[in-house]
Structure formats: structure tokens, C-alpha cells
């Protein structure tokens, strides 16, 4: 298996049609309530059941700018599928995520990709800061309503976290590029290498005639634990590790910025980013141990990611938490001292709080990837005058996704602090509906 090859191969048409038959087409479909972008789930599934796959894809695109992406990376088991009526009958939920991916992939491979209808141009310019899922979703909905949409991206590639954060074995870049290409065909303009707040200010954008601005700049600032030894060589954030491997070909020693390829790698964390990091390290030939302070039951990662990580031979060391790192005389990390943890009473997240037992163990390692969450990059919010900020430099918004400055809306991780692709897309959709209402009234 190659390093970039996608692990989940998707459904065949026969399997998809058989699975679609299981959908009971409920009169009150609770699955739709579980979807942050309100996809008409029974409608697209019944189209698949009839063999009308292109119509199914059309239904998906009415509400989702990125169906092939969501079919791959959404935590369906916590959203739409968790509301499926079959669960009440002690049966497995309809595989909504697999079916969404099937319809989107089928349409792409058929060569008959339909574009959603676009309203006549209204001549109003809007700017989007960041080209991740929130920005792309917002851009798609605004261009459909006839707005002149410009997306400004700080990196050299469009796609935000879909490109730099999620490895290709889970979400191939070419899939993301097709979705971006569709937005281009609909009329969205993209500009890379533009840091709003540095390259160009919000005031300058407004002087260029932009009437509304949506900030979807994400959470690119990695969290660390603040323990001794985190500054040793080869201790890095998952953010840096994945960005370099995914976007900058850093696994290739011939590149300008090669990464240290560890033989014994420790990944700290229990979310999807931790799974992506350990599965990436495994593909680079490492012996990988995942260290997580709670038990496996409390891991926030998608069940499918945990299953794949285990199948690929990742060692799980739960109820352990790094206390400090050790290094050789050159300052390169060579080990980690771990606190052995036990679960206490539930905390505010509803999960049982991990507490130290007083016991420690030591592991050898030559690389550590820290995946304990991210915070919004303060650069964009701090560069906007009169903007109310929350904890950790998040942008404070109302229900309509409007900030304390009425012409500026925001969504995704810059508001939430660190969430999922689909929640960011839901924010982008809500912001688009409300900003369009404001600008057209």
C-alpha cells in the first residue's frame, strides 16, 4: 500500500443501492436534524435506491459545498447516523456517510458534474478570509445568490485544514481540488499567499469596495502542555508535523525543508488529529505509540479512525500522560516520563476526569508529536479594530454569525476554537444566509 493511498475504498453501486433500501424515508426524518448543514438525507438516499445517482448528487449539492469531503471526514456516528430510526430498533444505522461519499464520487467519476444554479450577478463584492471548510461553504452559498466573492488564503494552496491537516490516505487532495474547481466554475475568485491583517488590512478591503467580510481563518495555533522538555529538538505540534508532510513533501529528504523521520514516535492525544499523526508516522516507517490520558472509551476521535489506527499496528497506551521529556547531549528528544492516570468523576465535558496516581513510567522515543488541540491564530482577529474577542482570541458572534462589527461575520474554528469540518460548514452557510439578507435589504 502506498503512503498516500486512500484506506476506505467506498461502496460499489450494488452495495450502495442495497444500503439505500434500508432507509425508511421517515415522515419526520430526525437524521436531517442531526446534520449541521441540513442535507435532505432521505431524498438523496431514495435517489440512490432508484439508481438515480446523479440526482442524488444534485440533492447533496443543494445544501453542501463539499459532499465528497463530508462523506469522508464527518463524524456521522455522532450526527446524522446517531438519530437514525434503526438504532431504536437495535439495528445498525443507515450508512449515510458512505452513501453521501458514494453519490459524490460517482458523479465526479461519471464526468457529468452538474453545477448548482447561480442567481444573476447583483454586483455586491464580499471577501472571505481563509479557504477552509467555513470559507468555502460561505463562498459557495454567496456566489449562488449572485454575489461577487473573493477568497483570500494565507497559504500557497486553497483548502485550509482540508489540505494541511487531513492526510491524503483519509482525504485525497484531488478530491478537495475538484470541489474547489466547482466553486471556481461558479464564479468564486481565489487568491493565495494573502495574509489578511498583514498583506492587506480589513480597512483596505473595504476601501476596495468589499461590502461584507466573512472571517473563517481557523485555528492554526497549536496548544502545548507546558511541561519540561517541550522545546527539545524533534518535539513538535501535530499542526506542524501534518502541514509539513501533507503540503510541503517534507517526508522526502531531497526537499528544502525535510522533516526528521523518527523510528520510535510518540503521539500525544486522542482526537482525529492524533490519529492522523500516528497513522502518518506509521506510513513513514516508524514504530508508533499513541499516549492518551483517559481511557479509549473517552477518545473524541471518530470510531473509524481508531479502528484503522489499530489495524495498522499503532500501539495504544491509554491512561498515561506526559510529565516531561528527556534529551541527549545535543538536545534531541530521547524519552518521555509519563504519569500513570486513573479516571475520577466526570468533568464539564461529561467525560471522567483523569487524575494522576503518583506512579510514573519512562518510554524511549526519537520523535514526539503533540496533538492536544489548537487555538485560533490571533493574527487576523487582533488586526481588526473594534472586534469583540472571546477566550483564546476567538471572535464573538451572535446567532446570525455576525461579529461586534456589523459588516463582519465569522464562523468555524475562529469562533468555536477547534471543532469539525461540518460544523464549520454549517457556520459558513448560516453566515451567508444572514449576510445576504443584510446586504440585499
Label each PLM-derived region with a short phrase.
Residues 2-20, 40-72, 90-118, 245-246, ...:
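Ferredoxin-type iron-sulfur electron-transfer modules in oxidoreductases and energy-metabolism complexes
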Amino acid at each position: 500500500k502506498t503512503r498516500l493511498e486512500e484506506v476506505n475504498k467506498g461502496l460499489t453501486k450494488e452495495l450502495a443501492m442495497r444500503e439505500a433500501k434500508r432507509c425508511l424515508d421517515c415522515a419526520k426524518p430526525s437524521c436531517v436534524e442531526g446534520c449541521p448543514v441540513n442535507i435532505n438525507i432521505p431524498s438523496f438516499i431514495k435517489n440512490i435506491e432508484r439508481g438515480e445517482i446523479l440526482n442524488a448528487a444534485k440533492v447533496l449539492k443543494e445544501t453542501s459545498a463539499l459532499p465528497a469531503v463530508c462523506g469522508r471526514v464527518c463524524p456521522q456516528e455522532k450526527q446524522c447516523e446517531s438519530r437514525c430510526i434503526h438504532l431504536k430498533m437495535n439495528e445498525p444505522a443507515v450508512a449515510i456517510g458512505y452513501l453521501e461519499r458514494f453519490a459524490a464520487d460517482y458523479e465526479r467519476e461519471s464526468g457529468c458534474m452538474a453545477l448548482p444554479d447561480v442567481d444573476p450577478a447583483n454586483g455586491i463584492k464580499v471577501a472571505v478570509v481563509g479557504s477552509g471548510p467555513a470559507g468555502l461553504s460561505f463562498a459557495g452559498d454567496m456566489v449562488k445568490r449572485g454575489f461577487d466573492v473573493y477568497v483570500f488564503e494565507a497559504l500557497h494552496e486553497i483548502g485550509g485544514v482540508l489540505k494541511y491537516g487531513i492526510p491524503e490516505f483519509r482525504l485525497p487532495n484531488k478530491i478537495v481540488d475538484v470541489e474547489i474547481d466547482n466553486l471556481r466554475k461558479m464564479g468564486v475568485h481565489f487568491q493565495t499567499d494573502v495574509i489578511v491583517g498583514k498583506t492587506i488590512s480589513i480597512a483596505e478591503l473595504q476601501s476596495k469596495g468589499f461590502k461584507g467580510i466573512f472571517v473563517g481563518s481557523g485555528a492554526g495555533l497549536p496548544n502545548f502542555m507546558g511541561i519540561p522538555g517541550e522545546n527539545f529538538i524533534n518535539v513538535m505540534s501535530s499542526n506542524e508535523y501534518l502541514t509539513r508532510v501533507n503540503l510541503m513533501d517534507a517526508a522526502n529528504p531531497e526537499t528544502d525543508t525535510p522533516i526528521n523521520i523518527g523510528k520510535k514516535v510518540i503521539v500525544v492525544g486522542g482526537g482525529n488529529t492524533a490519529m492522523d499523526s500516528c497513522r502518518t508516522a506509521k506510513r513513514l516507517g516508524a514504530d508508533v505509540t499513541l499516549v492518551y490520558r483517559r481511557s479509549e472509551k473517552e477518545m473524541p476521535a471518530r470510531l473509524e479512525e481508531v479502528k484503522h489506527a489499530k489495524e495498522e499496528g499503532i500501539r495504544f497506551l491509554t491512561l498515561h500522560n506526559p510529565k516531561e521529556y528527556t534529551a541527549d547531549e545535543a538536545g534531541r528528544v530521547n524519552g518521555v516520563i509519563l504519569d500513570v492516570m486513573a479516571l475520577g468523576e466526570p468533568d464539564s465535558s461529561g467525560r471522567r476526569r483523569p487524575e494522576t496516581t503518583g506512579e510514573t513510567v519512562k518510554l524511549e522515543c526519537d520523535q514526539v508529536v503533540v496533538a492536544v488541540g489548537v487555538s485560533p491564530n490571533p493574527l487576523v482577529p487582533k488586526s481588526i479594530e473594534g472586534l469583540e474577542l472571546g477566550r483564546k482570541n476567538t471572535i464573538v458572534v451572535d446567532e446570525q454569525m455576525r461579529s461586534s462589527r456589523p459588516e463582519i461575520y465569522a464562523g468555524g474554528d475562529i469562533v468555536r476554537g477547534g471543532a469539525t469540518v461540518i460544523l464549520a460548514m454549517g457556520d459558513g452557510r448560516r453566515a451567508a444566509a444572514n449576510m445576504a439578507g443584510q446586504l440585499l435589504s
